[in-house]
């Protein structure tokens, strides 16, 4: 469904651009299960990479249309340019490999829902293993993927449940600082002198849409 949503935005860009996006700069992210979804969307390359035990996830994926799914908007790319993880994790660390998308993560190191290191999700043996920030970023460093992490010492999984919490606000600012250099508009060599004199500054926002 997330891939279908990304395809929808690119389809909309090609048919009027209701949302004013840059189709070549799409970041995907979320918190908790949303972060887990975003991470796996970006880093799983083939259905054959998926586990078959204790659950046959390959069969599930194939029944739902493969990695691209069957939720529509086909013919448009679902590729992303970066991943944002608030308290998320990945099932298999080796899925993060060379030339993958940049990763920024924020997590408490006492998280028992999605382990900061590696453990079954929700702390239950019947749930697939998830490896959190403490393991994903050494893997990203190992294979040369651009990454950064913000760790909240002693914090559990609940810090990202409130958008007004000090940790959540800090995480937003940290994420903004990580993503900002990745935006194409920071490549000033792509702006000609003529174009720059014709542009008028209307307002300044950060990458999350907040007016600065």
Q: Predicted regions span which residues?
A:
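Primarily recognizes the serine-hydrolase "nucleophile elbow" in alpha/beta-hydrolase
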Residues: 4-99
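Extracytoplasmic/secreted cell-surface and envelope-processing proteins
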Residues: 91-95, 113-116, 158-162
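Hydrophobic anchor at the start of a short beta-strand
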Residues: 26, 103, 147-148
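Conserved alpha/beta-hydrolase "acid-adjacent" motif
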Residues: 112-132
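Extracytoplasmic/secreted proteins, especially bacterial periplasmic and envelope-associated proteins
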Residues: 1-4, 8, 36-40, 79, ...
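Short beta-strand/loop motif that positions the catalytic acidic residue
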Residues: 105-107, 111
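C-terminal catalytic histidine-bearing segment of alpha/beta-hydrolase fold enzymes
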Residues: 130, 134-187
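Residue-level detector of functionally pivotal "anchor" positions at catalytic/ligand-binding pockets or at interdomain
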Residues: 181-211
């Amino acid at each position: 469904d997330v891939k279908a949503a990304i395809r929808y935005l690119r389809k909309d860009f090609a048919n009027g651009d209701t949302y004013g996006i840059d189709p070549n700069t799409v970041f995907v992210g979320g918190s908790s299960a949303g972060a887990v979804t975003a991470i796996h969307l970006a880093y799983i390359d083939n259905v054959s990479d998926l586990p078959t035990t204790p659950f046959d996830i390959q069969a599930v994926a194939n029944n739902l249309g493969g990695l691209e799914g069957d939720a529509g908007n086909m013919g448009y790319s679902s590729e992303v340019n970066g991943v944002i993880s608030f308290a998320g994790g990945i099932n298999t660390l080796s899925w993060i490999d060379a030339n993958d998308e940049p990763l920024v993560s924020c997590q408490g190191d006492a998280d028992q829902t999605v382990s900061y290191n590696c453990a079954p999700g929700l702390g239950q043996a019947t749930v697939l293993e998830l490896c959190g920030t403490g393991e994903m970023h050494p893997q990203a460093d190992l294979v040369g993927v651009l990454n950064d992490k913000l760790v909240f010492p002693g914090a559990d999984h609940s810090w990202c449940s409130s958008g007004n919490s000090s940790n959540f606000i800090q995480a937003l600012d940290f994420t903004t600082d990580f993503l900002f250099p990745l935006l194409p508009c920071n490549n000033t060599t792509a702006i000609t002198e003529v174009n720059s004199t014709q542009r008028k500054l209307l307002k300044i926002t950060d990458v999350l849409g907040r007016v600065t």
